[in-house]
């Protein structure tokens, strides 16, 4: 090291200006009280006091003052003479964030009092939310945990007013209130609907203070990736490098390489900031490379960089790489991306830590790091430091880590600041707009002089790096003392305290002997590093000199983010077989509660999780500012008295005082660590009485300001007195044979989500079964202890793997008579060759012939695969299972020229998959329903099952079911009431509303079980979520929501329907109030002056237009909805609506026309309103319109209405609108007054109602629903009301026997214990004659369901004209991949001007799947509102059809090759008039080998 010395100025002027006692030792009593300048309310804090030269016991008091009030924190706390200790205190709270604290020390002869500002911070407890995984599919269950701890990470039994789930549209879809965290943790879950809004959801936890903690997760339709594409390349490269090596690898989730084609695309894109006038020069520069992956699944390419013009500006300063890997055999292609920054800064210097202040006579020190452009340390290089303004120059050499410790002797320094610039290489100063030059960054730092009137100092030697928990760190302290002041002293006491997490953590003292006259030297303090000090601690040390001067220093230490609760998680081994038993061991502090999680690595590949980590936990701690500065708050100053700034003449020389001293002092050091110091010692630098703006020596810039401005790259200006901390740039087996077989069918995404309490020894264990997925599982845990607090485990892995396994490839469904190739692929991941036998289990359900000859065994060497195929022709209908087994054999035979080894464990892998085998033609269903009510007599019903002449052979099947409850069938099928799609806002309500009626009915009849309740509640939750997809921003709802087009208005009818349903569902699930309020407000704006409601939006059901006019029918419906919410009759909206209806009824009653539909709604509306007279008038009028058949009663629309076609022995099925209007009449009979219970109905009304019920019950389908949505909803409401009115809890039972003319006989027992149980039997004789006998006492509901397929027959009177054509798009002769287009033309040819909403249901030809983008694109057409892909069907929703032809097309592609392809049907039907339908068939254009379209 070499140094250039410059003369230093004397302190003469300062000496003359200082008070006379600055150099005179005294022994006056000295008090120091230390309190954090920011304190937490409700959390214990400490006030520390040290006394010097106090020869008596004194009393310490702390008083908090705010708003003219005083609160005693410490009252007359006795403090022994010459002691140093801390006393705890707690501030319960303050209405103001800034208050004052007064310290008073008094004794027999002493009194000291001072006041200073402090800030009170409300200590919000750290809270975090953990979900079981970061991404979910529609219909999955979201599981999450809420955890609360205090600032010491101990569990907090906190109660949160509300926890809720928020959708991407900020709708609240689920809510829990008053959630109490026993032991600091609570687990919750909720189901996503099968059709939720996709995007980012939030779990929101709201605290009592109103603060919200949010945790996000994503809902997305996804397929878990089988493998990951990894790009290995350097993150940064120098712009002078000529080659860039890139490696792309494919790795399965279970760790094995992916065979396939690797394609690399390497680009340097042009900068968007560059002008576009350079034409071709502005284009991106790209190169492409392609090659088969090697045996490690990788492709390595060394890219020449010359083509990318790295020295030229105007392009992005990075190289971007995209790698695609197409898996061999499947064609599955996944992508990975990577990038490499281009750097012209070939070296970087940075201070990792450096003194912020300097003290003359003590070494100024710091540490610098030298790295190259990649962040790699540069060792054994000379670096130069220059200290200004003195010009000192020093040379240091970096070590093997690129670090150099800098130490500068400051013995002769007197400047108010110093600046240190460290340089490795000088830069060539030249700038070119289009050309890059080599650049080397410097490290630049400024430090400020610490003022001491006696030139006495203490300084903490810098400690570099992060301190590990549990270690003892020796801290070296340098000191320099004024000999004149200390000459009579035998020792000096140094006091130190440690501040962590904003509070005083620990304290101590060190007595330094001065008997040897050692006024300059070093001593050490051992500091024990504890978890409570993390993540950063401040060490403050000070001493009080005999001249009353206080000298001090402070330093920040980075502490390892550790926890007192050490958590260890382990599996017995790193690899296990699928479906094997294992256990997860956890060890932590005794009696901890541990939360365990294990997730499929595939999920994390899809969406990497922001998992719990020490960093994320520590980030939750409430923050205190280091300095505790109070901006804009009055602070009681305790500066020294000012000194004169006038010129002084000495020995004939005139001295001008230096103004605006930029030095730091002891006070600023305490302030830098957020400590308020109350003392009578000298802690301030001199202050001149006159403010003087100009500082001539520095050209008008104050030294401190210059120090800030001068800090350049690599420096950081931090709290005064605390050294700056920088960031690093760098980122043998027993041969006993055991046959082991695995049958794999359990494939979860989250495997473990459990709470495990630990025993007194701190051990716990969870026994689990490894799922069947061959993948890597990532497991982690956190534990909570009341004593040691929170602890986190590291993430551990378990590979679920077996040395070989089997994969089956087969289609979803085929038509009887078709043949397909079943492929079984065996993968061997052992290091040696083995003999494998692959068998397909024989079954009478199919015929399987091996393809390419039959071999007893197959040889598969390490990391190879073998595919075995069978040509399969199904023989049975329905779900046909295929069971394939691969077994490793003990065999001495050679595999080619390689020896086979006998596996240590001979494994069998069995995979079971199914194919649905469907009959030809289209499916038809007929039902026969009857209500049988024997009263201690035997009733008998003879009936027969017949089949139509065009039935497809073998397709017929029939069942007979018995239920003791009229709603029993619906209860069994709450989510499957209709065999129709549910893809719009109204259809979704049929999944939602019946659950309310079922819950209310079972509650009222005291039959509700937990199982039914749980199921219905979950359906309500799911339906609520889905319905919000159809909500508009104004609170209204429409059939397709915003999906129907940006300008689609809200639908008045649907909004009323949703409003009523949400209001009624509130008693069962959480419904956000604003959804009800906003819908009602929107609906209110649609009410006209006459009380009627105007229509908004398109009515998809024409039946609503069948009344006098749309307005009356609609108004009646909305009035019913408002009354059922329920709103009182006195409410203005209801009162006005009833006026509208009364006016309409007056008009209708004078009319000669029969408005049955409208009258049915009016009757129910007046019944709900309690208007007996109007109800009676309407029911009397309706009675004249009734259709009376034997013991049943119903209503139908005027005119000759065509019934739904049925076989002669079945009752004709009524159209949807007639079921709906009949159900409304039934509701009117069952509602005499809204306030009266249903059971108070007259016997006359009940008698009429029972006749209506008999007719309605006969219209039910086999799932408990009816034809369409509205008839199902209203009819189930009416049936539930009737069921409640007639329910009796009888101990009697009914016996039902069904017999055929052959030998078949089956008896059912129905009683109060099993009345909700569905009892069913398959009928053997088709066709056949049967008799049903009923005896006992009570009512039973009987249903016979017959299903069969028929071949489509052209009908000249079809209500829809349907034309289908197919055209090949890609005719692959090999048959590996074929695509074709389906072109559909459709129009309405029925009797109405237009249809209702229409569904086009396109079934896929076997082995083909739709190309989803082409299906989605159909929604761009004006009349097509929505499309769905549902297994092997494409559903297209059309708003309405007229006689104008609507044409559209989409593409399909081959998924699995199938031979002898059969045609597939396309069905077009009216959603609300399901008897109006047309069916056509189409064939794949490859079926006959031609390339022409056919249908």
Swiss-Prot record:
Residues 686-744 are annotated as: Bait region. There is a cross-link at residues 984-987 (Isoglutamyl cysteine thioester (Cys-Gln)). Residues 1-24 form the signal peptide. This is Pregnancy zone protein. GO terms for biological process: embryo implantation. SMART domains: A2M, A2M_N_2, A2M_recep, Thiol-ester_cl. Highest expression in liver, medium expression in ovary, heart and stomach. Low expression in lung, kidney and uterus. Protein found in plasma. Is able to inhibit all four classes of proteinases by a unique 'trapping' mechanism. This protein has a peptide stretch, called the 'bait region' which contains specific cleavage sites for different proteinases. When a proteinase cleaves the bait region, a conformational change is induced in the protein which traps the proteinase. The entrapped enzyme remains active against low molecular weight substrates (activity against high molecular weight substrates is greatly reduced). Keywords: Bait region, Disulfide bond, Glycoprotein, Protease inhibitor, Secreted, Serine protease inhibitor, Signal, Thioester bond. Disulfide bonds join 48-86, 249-298, 267-286, 469-562, 594-783, 642-689, 833-861, 859-895, 933-1339, 1092-1140. One of its GO terms (cellular component) is extracellular region. The keyword DNA-binding does not apply. Its main location: secreted. It is found in: Secreted. The keyword Ribosomal protein does not apply. Glycans are attached at residues 55, 157, 382, 405, 412, 568, 881, 942, 1003, 1385, 1443. Belongs to the protease inhibitor I39 (alpha-2-macroglobulin) family. GO terms for molecular function: endopeptidase inhibitor activity; serine-type endopeptidase inhibitor activity.
């Amino acid at each position: 090291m070499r140094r250039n010395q410059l003369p230093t100025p004397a302190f003469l002027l300062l000496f003359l200006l200082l008070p006379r006692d600055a150099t005179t030792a005294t022994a006056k009593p000295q008090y120091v009280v230390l309190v954090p300048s920011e304190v937490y309310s409700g959390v214990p804090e400490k006030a520390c006091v040290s006394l010097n030269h106090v020869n008596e016991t004194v009393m310490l008091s702390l008083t908090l003052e705010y708003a003219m009030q005083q609160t005693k924190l410490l009252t007359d706390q006795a403090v022994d003479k010459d002691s140093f200790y801390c006393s705890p205190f707690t501030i319960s709270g303050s209405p103001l964030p800034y208050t004052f604290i007064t310290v008073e020390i008094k004794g027999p002869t002493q009194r000291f009092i001072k006041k200073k500002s402090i800030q009170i911070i409300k200590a919000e407890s750290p809270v975090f939310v953990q979900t079981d995984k970061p991404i979910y599919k529609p219909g999955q269950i979201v599981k999450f945990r809420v955890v609360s701890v205090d600032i010491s990470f101990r569990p907090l039994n906190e109660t949160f007013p509300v926890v809720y789930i928020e959708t991407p549209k900020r709708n609240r879809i689920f809510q829990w209130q008053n959630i109490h965290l026993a032991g600091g943790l609570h687990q919750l879950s909720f189901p996503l609907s099968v059709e939720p809004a996709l995007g980012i959801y939030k779990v929101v936890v709201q605290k009592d203070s109103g603060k919200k903690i949010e945790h996000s997760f994503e809902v997305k339709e996804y397929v878990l990736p089988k493998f990951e594409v990894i790009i290995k390349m350097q993150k940064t490269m120098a712009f002078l490098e000529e080659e860039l090596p890139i490696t792309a690898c494919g790795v399965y989730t279970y760790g094995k390489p992916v065979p396939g084609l690797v394609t690399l695309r390497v680009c340097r894109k042009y900068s968007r900031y560059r002008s576009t006038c350079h034409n071709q020069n502005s284009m991106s520069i790209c190169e492409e490379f392609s090659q088969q992956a090697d045996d490690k699944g990788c492709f390595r390419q060394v890219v020449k960089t010359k083509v990318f013009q790295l020295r030229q500006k105007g392009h992005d300063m990075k190289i971007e790489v995209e790698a695609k890997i197409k898996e061999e055999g499947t064609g599955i292609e996944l992508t990975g991306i990577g990038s490499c920054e281009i750097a012209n800064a070939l070296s970087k210097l940075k201070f990792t830590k450096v003194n912020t202040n300097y003290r003359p006579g003590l070494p100024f020190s710091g540490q610098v790091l030298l790295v190259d452009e990649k962040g790699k340390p540069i060792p054994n290089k000379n670096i130069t430091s220059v200290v200004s303004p003195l010009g000192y120059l020093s040379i240091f050499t970096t070590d093997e880590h690129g670090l150099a410790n800098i130490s500068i002797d400051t013995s002769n320094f007197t400047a108010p600041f110093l600046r240190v610039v460290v340089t490795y290489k000088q830069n060539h100063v030249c700038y070119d707009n289009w050309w890059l030059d080599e650049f080397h960054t410097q490290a630049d730092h400024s430090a400020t002089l610490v003022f001491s009137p006696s030139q006495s100092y203490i300084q903490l030697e810098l400690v570099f790096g992060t301190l590990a928990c549990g270690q003892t760190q020796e801290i070296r302290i340098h000191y320099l003392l004024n000999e004149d002041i200390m000459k009579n002293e035998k020792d000096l006491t140094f006091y130190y305290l440690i501040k962590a997490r904003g509070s005083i953590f620990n304290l101590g003292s060190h007595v330094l002997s001065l008997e040897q006259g050692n006024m300059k030297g070093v001593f050490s303090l051992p500091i024990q590093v504890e978890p409570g000090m993390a993540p950063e601690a401040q060490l403050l040390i000070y001493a009080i000199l005999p001249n009353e001067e206080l000298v001090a220093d402070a330093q920040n230490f980075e502490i390892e983010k550790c926890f007192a609760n050490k958590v260890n998680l382990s599996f017995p081994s790193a690899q296990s077989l699928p479906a094997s038993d294992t256990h997860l061991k956890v060890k932590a502090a005794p009696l901890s509660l541990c939360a365990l999680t294990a997730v499929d690595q595939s999920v994390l590949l899809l969406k990497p999780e922001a998992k719990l980590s020490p960093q994320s936990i520590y980030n939750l701690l409430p923050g205190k500012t280091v300095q505790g500065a109070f901006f804009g708050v009055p602070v009681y100053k305790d500066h020294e008295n000012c000194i004169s700034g006038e010129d002084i003449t000495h020995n004939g020389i005139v001295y001008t005082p230096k103004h605006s001293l930029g030095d730091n002092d002891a006070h600023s050091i305490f302030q830098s660590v957020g400590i308020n110091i109350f003392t009578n010692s000298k802690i301030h630098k001199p202050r001149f009485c006159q403010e003087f703006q100009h500082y001539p020596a520095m050209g008008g810039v104050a030294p401190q300001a210059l120090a800030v401005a001068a800090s350049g790259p690599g420096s950081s200006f931090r709290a005064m007195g605390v050294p700056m901390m920088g960031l690093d740039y760098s980122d043998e087996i027993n041969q006993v044979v055991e046959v082991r077989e695995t049958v794999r069918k359990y494939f979860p995404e989250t495997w473990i989500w459990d709470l495990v309490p630990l025993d007194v020894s701190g051990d716990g264990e969870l026994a689990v079964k490894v799922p069947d997925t061959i993948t890597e599982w990532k497991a982690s845990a956190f534990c909570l202890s009341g004593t040691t607090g929170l602890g986190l485990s590291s993430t551990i892995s378990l590979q679920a793997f077996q040395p070989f396994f089997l994969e089956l490839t087969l289609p979803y469904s085929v038509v009887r008579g078709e043949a397909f190739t079943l492929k079984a692929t065996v993968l061997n991941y052992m290091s040696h060759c083995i003999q494998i036998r692959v068998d397909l289990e024989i079954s009478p359900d199919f015929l399987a012939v091996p393809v390419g000859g039959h071999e007893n065994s197959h040889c598969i060497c390490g990391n190879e695969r073998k595919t075995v195929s069978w040509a399969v022709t199904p023989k049975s209908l329905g779900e046909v299972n295929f069971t394939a087994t691969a077994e490793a054999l003990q065999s001495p035979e050679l595999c080619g020229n390689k020896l086979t080894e006998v596996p240590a464990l001979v494994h069998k892998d069995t995979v079971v998959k199914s194919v649905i085998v469907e009959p030809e033609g289209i499916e038809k269903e007929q039902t026969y329903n009857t209500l049988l009510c024997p009263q201690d007599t035997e009733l008998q019903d003879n009936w027969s099952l017949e089949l139509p002449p065009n039935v497809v052979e073998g397709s017929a099947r029939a069942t007979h079911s018995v239920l003791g409850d009229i709603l029993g069938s619906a209860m069994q099928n709450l989510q499957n009431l209709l065999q129709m799609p549910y893809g719009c806002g109204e259809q979704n309500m049929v999944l939602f509303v019946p659950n309310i009626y079922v819950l209310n009915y079972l509650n009222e009849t005291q039959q509700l079980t937990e199982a039914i309740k749980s199921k219905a509640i979950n359906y309500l939750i799911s339906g609520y979520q889905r319905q919000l997809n159809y909500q508009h921003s104004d609170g209204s709802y429409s059939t397709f929501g915003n999906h129907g087009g940006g300008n689609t208005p809200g639908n008045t009818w649907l909004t009323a329907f949703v409003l009523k349903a949400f209001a009624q569902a509130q008693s069962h699930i959480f419904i956000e109030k604003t959804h009800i309020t906003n819908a009602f407000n929107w609906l209110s704006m649609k009410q006209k002056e006459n009380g009627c409601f105007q229509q908004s939006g398109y009515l998809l059901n024409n039946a609503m237009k069948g009344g006098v006019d749309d307005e009356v029918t609609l108004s009646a419906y909305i009035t019913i909805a408002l009354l059922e919410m329920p709103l009182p009759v006195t409410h203005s909206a209801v009162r006005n609506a009833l006026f509208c209806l009364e006016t309409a009824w007056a008009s209708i009653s004078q009319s000669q026309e029969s408005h049955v539909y409208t009258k049915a709604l009016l009757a129910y509306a007046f019944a709900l309103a309690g208007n007996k007279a109007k109800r009676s008038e309407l029911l009397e009028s309706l009675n004249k319109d009734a259709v009376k058949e034997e013991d049943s009663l119903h209503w139908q629309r005027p005119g000759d209405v065509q019934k739904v076609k049925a076989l002669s022995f079945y009752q004709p099925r009524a159209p949807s609108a007639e079921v709906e209007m009949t159900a409304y009449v039934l509701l009117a009979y069952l509602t005499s007054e809204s306030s009266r219970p249903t059971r108070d109905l007259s016997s006359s009304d009940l008698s009429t109602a029972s006749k209506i019920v008999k007719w309605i019950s006969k219209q039910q389908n086999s799932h408990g629903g009816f034809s369409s949505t509205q008839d199902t909803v209203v009819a189930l409401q009416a049936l539930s009301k009737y069921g409640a009115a007639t329910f009796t809890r009888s101990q009697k039972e009914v016996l039902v026997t069904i017999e055929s003319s052959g030998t078949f006989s089956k008896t059912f027992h129905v009683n109060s214990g099993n009345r909700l149980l569905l009892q069913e039997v398959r009928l053997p004789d088709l066709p056949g004659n049967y008799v049903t006998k009923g005896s006992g006492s009570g009512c039973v509901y009987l249903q016979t369901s017959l299903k069969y397929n028929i071949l489509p027959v052209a009908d000249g009177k079809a209500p829809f004209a349907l034309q289908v054509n197919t055209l090949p798009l890609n005719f692959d002769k090999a048959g590996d991949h074929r695509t074709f287009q389906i072109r559909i033309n459709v129009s309405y040819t029925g009797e109405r001007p237009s249809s209702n909403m229409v569904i086009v249901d396109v079934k896929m030809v076997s082995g083909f799947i739709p190309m989803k983008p082409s299906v989605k694109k159909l929604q761009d057409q004006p009349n097509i509102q929505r499309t769905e892909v549902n297994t092997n069907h494409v559903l297209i929703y059309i708003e309405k059809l007229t006689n104008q032809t609507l044409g559209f097309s989409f593409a399909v592609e081959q998924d699995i090759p199938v031979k002898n392809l059969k045609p597939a049907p396309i069905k077009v039907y009216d959603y609300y008039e399901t008897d109006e339908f047309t069916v056509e068939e189409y064939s794949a254009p490859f079926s006959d080998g031609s390339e022409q379209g056919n249908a």
